[in-house]
Amino acid sequence: MAKPVIVGAVRTAIGRSFKGALANVPTETLATTVLPEVVRRAGLEPAAVDDVVFAELNYGGGDLARHAAVACGMETVPGQAVNRHCAGSLTAIANASAHIRADMERVLVAGGVQSLSTAPLMKWRKPDSGPEMEFIEPWIPPSHPETPDAPTMDMSVTVGWNTAKAVGISRAEMDAWALRSHQRACDAIEAGKFVDEIVPLKVTRADGIVLDFAVDEHPRRDTTLERLAALPVLHPEIEGFSITAGNSSGINDAGAAVALVGDDYAAAEGLEVMATVRAWANVGVAPRDTGLGAVKVIGKVLERAGLAVGDVALWEINEAFASTPIAACREYGMDEERVNFSGSGCSLGHPISASGARMVTTLIYELRRRGGGIGVAAMCAGGGMGGALVLEV
């Protein structure tokens, strides 16, 4: 049985949705940027790829992975689209790893892309409302009337606020975590830590100037506790509500992908192994407790990998809201210095379907800089889920 290993990892820089550098870049372009680049960096022949597995939450044009493969001249390579909301690209990597472990395929590319800027709106007709319809964002559809807690499915409630209430996290603590996130992300950018993992993407500005977009644009060096404290809460009608735009993740655009092969294939072809995929896991929780999905899945994935918290060198716990990593640190007694070492969702942003692969990519490059070790990427996922992946460099 082959061990799944990663032989290439790449991402685009993360753009701010709607008015950022990637606002007019189609989803397909994000995919056709990271796919050929990760194949090239891995030293693979495009025709050797057995399958492309991409996550994209709201792509309206069918199988994005296959479209990307064809557009990149890989017509003999099939593709499959997956969707596990925020954890989609973690699932893509896990599915590819499972195929390798089962000796079904030898070479795969897995990842995810997200362009919330260009996401198509969809029309929604409420039951028994007659012909009247309204436009809504497809990544946050209205709750099904039979879903428990349907009126409270807003992510700032189910991920941010309910987690903060359950664990007893104050707004001051969440704001402090968000500030830390921006500071760490800005420090990483200024130190050039992301240069190796980012593939520049040519974009055309509104004034016609073409530039290479290669620096994450969401982190803000001018973030302060005072500015965060001055932001209004998102639901003032809820007593004690403490979630703001500042201690939440951004709305963003990006793409990320990794190339996976079996360890035997890597040895035979002389490929450089960047990381081994040790384990992966997913959990379900009540939709009202979505934020706790990231907390619960950590215990499950560590058990599968046969590891203890102290065995992990670095953690990437997605900051969909600041309350999530804080809750995980409390639950497992983590060393916070090892958590979100270069920022996360509050600062870098959260390009939903790309975030998992982005986290894996950043983990790999940082662990390599530090001489290796075990890394864990974990995140909650919309609808009441959590996903996680364990790597060893």
Where are each of the predicted segments found?
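N-terminal extracellular/periplasmic Venus flytrap/periplasmic-binding protein-like
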Residues: 11-12, 24-28, 41, 173-268, ...
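Conserved catalytic cysteine-centered active-site region
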Residues: 55-107, 150-156, 222-250, 331-358, ...
